[in-house]
C-alpha cells in the first residue's frame, strides 16, 4: 500500500520525448507503472513523493523521487543510494526487513530513475560535485540531521564522496560493492577481475554512454535485457511475481529515457570498472570519527583490495570489511536475508551509541588471502545477537558452483 505525490511533474517532463517515443516505447508514466509492479509485493507501507531541491544541476529546479518507510520511528534513519542504471525499485528485497527497524529513505539519484534529468557538466570533478550538492539539498529539504548512508556500486562512490564533504551528517557509512575505488591498472587485461567479454564490450563502446545499446534497441529493449540478464532476474524470482517480465521492464524504462545521469557517469569513468579520480586516494580526507563498513560479494568483479587498504590505513577509525560468500556484485539481492541482517545489526549499534563488533572476527578468514579470494561468513557477527536469531546464525552462506554467475553479474 502506498501514497504517491507529484504526478504532474512527470506529465511536464514527458514533453522531452517527442519523436523519440516513436522508436523507444517509454515514458515516465510507464516507468511509474513498472516501479509499482516491482514494489507490489511489499508488506510495508510507504510514501512516494518528489522533493524539489532547487537548481543544483543545470538551469532549472530538480526534483528527486523519494520513497520513505516508517518515518514515525525515532530511530536513526537509513538512506539508500542505488547503483548505476538502477533505481529505488531494486531495493525491493530489502525494504520490509530494513523498515521494520527504522525510517528508510531511498532516492532515485538525480539523472536516473524517476528523478529529474538535467544536463550535467562534462568535467568529472564538477559533475561529481553536482551529484553531491543535489544529495545535500535533498537532505536539507527532508530535515535529516544525521543518518546511516548506504550506497551500492556507483551509489557507494557517491556515498563516500558525500561523507567526505559532509561528515557531520553520517552516523555510519556502509559501502556495498562500491564502484570507483581502485586505481586503474597500467595493464588492464592482466589479472583483471572484470570478465574478458565485459572488457571487450567496454573497449568498443568507450566513446558512447554505457547503456546506449538499450535505447538503440528501441522496442526490443526489454527483450534484450531479458536475454542479457537472466541472472539478475533470478535474484528476484522468489519474491517478485512475474520477475522475468517485471525486472527487465523496470530496468528498460529506467534507462530508455534522457540519459543525463548516464552521461555524467561516463564523464567520471576511466573504463567501465574505474573512476578518473579513484576514491581510494581520497578516503584519508574522511573524518576519522566516521565509522565505515564495506560489504563485498565473494563472486563480484569489484576489486575489494581497496576495502582492506582503507581498513589498514585508518587505524584510528572503525573500519570493517565483510565479504558475503556466494554473492556477486548485486550483494543486496544475491544474499538479501544476510545483507539485511548485517545492515540491521549495524543500525542497532548506531541506535545504542556503540560500534558494531567486527563482523570479521576470525583473522584467518578476514585478513588473509582466503578472505580476499573466498569471502567470509557472518556467523561470528550473528552470534552476538539475541538467542531468537539462532535460526539465522546457522544459515551461513555457501559459494555458488556456477562460475558463469560472477561473469554475468558484471554489469
Regions found by a protein language model. Give the residues of each.
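Flexible "cap/lid" subdomain of the alpha/beta-hydrolase fold that forms the substrate-access gate
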Residues: 2-46, 74, 125-133, 140-141, ...
Amino acid at each position: 500500500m502506498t501514497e504517491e505525490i507529484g504526478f504532474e511533474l512527470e506529465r511536464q517532463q514527458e514533453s522531452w520525448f517527442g519523436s523519440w517515443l516513436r522508436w523507444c516505447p517509454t515514458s515516465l508514466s510507464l516507468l511509474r507503472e513498472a516501479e509499482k509492479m516491482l514494489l507490489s509485493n511489499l508488506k510495508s507501507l510507504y510514501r512516494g513523493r518528489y522533493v524539489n531541491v532547487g537548481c543544483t544541476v543545470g538551469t532549472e529546479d530538480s526534483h528527486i523521487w523519494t520513497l520513505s518507510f516508517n518515518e514515525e520511528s525515532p530511530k536513526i534513519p537509513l538512506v539508500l543510494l542505488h547503483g548505476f542504471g538502477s533505481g529505488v525499485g531494486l531495493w525491493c528485497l530489502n525494504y520490509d526487513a530494513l523498515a521494520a527497524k527504522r525510517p528508510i529513505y531511498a532516492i532515485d539519484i538525480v539523472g536516473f530513475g524517476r528523478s529529474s534529468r538535467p544536463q550535467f557538466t562534462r568535467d568529472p570533478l564538477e559533475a561529481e560535485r553536482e551529484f553531491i550538492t543535489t544529495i545535500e539539498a535533498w537532505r536539507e529539504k527532508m530535515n535529516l540531521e544525521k543518518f546511516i548512508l548506504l550506497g551500492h556500486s556507483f551509489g557507494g562512490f557517491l556515498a563516500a564522496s558525500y561523507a567526505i564533504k559532509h561528515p557531520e551528517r553520517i552516523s555510519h557509512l556502509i559501502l556495498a560493492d562500491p564502484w570507483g575505488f581502485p586505481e586503474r591498472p597500467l595493464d588492464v587485461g592482466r589479472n583483471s577481475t572484470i570478465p574478458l567479454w565485459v572488457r571487450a564490450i567496454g573497449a568498443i563502446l568507450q566513446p558512447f554512454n554505457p547503456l546506449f545499446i538499450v535505447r538503440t534497441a528501441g522496442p526490443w529493449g526489454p527483450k534484450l535485457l531479458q536475454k542479457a540478464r537472466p541472472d539478475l532476474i533470478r535474484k528476484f524470482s522468489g519474491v517478485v511475481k512475474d520477475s522475468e517480465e517485471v525486472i527487465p521492464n523496470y530496468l528498460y524504462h529506467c534507462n530508455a529515457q534522457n540519459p543525463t545521469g548516464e552521461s555524467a557517469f561516463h564523464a567520471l569513468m576511466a573504463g567501465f570498472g574505474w573512476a578518473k579520480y579513484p576514491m581510494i586516494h581520497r578516503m584519508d580526507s574522511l573524518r576519522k570519527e566516521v565509522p565505515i563498513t564495506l560489504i563485498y560479494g565473494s563472486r563480484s568483479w569489484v576489486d575489494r583490495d581497496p576495502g582492506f587498504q582503507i581498513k589498514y590505513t585508518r587505524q584510528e577509525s572503525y573500519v570493517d570489511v565483510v565479504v558475503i560468500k556466494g554473492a556477486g556484485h548485486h550483494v543486496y539481492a544475491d544474499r538479501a536475508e544476510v545483507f539485511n541482517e548485517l545492515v540491521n545489526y549495524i543500525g542497532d549499534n548506531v541506535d545504542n551509541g556503540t560500534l558494531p563488533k567486527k563482523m570479521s572476527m576470525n583473522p584467518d578468514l578476514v585478513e588473509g588471502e582466503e578472505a580476499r579470494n573466498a569471502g567470509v561468513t557472518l556467523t561470528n557477527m550473528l552470534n552476538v545477537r539475541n538467542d531468537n536469531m539462532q535460526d539465522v546464525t546457522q544459515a551461513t552462506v555457501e559459494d555458488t558452483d556456477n562460475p558463469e554467475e560472477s561473469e554475468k553479474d558484471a554489469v
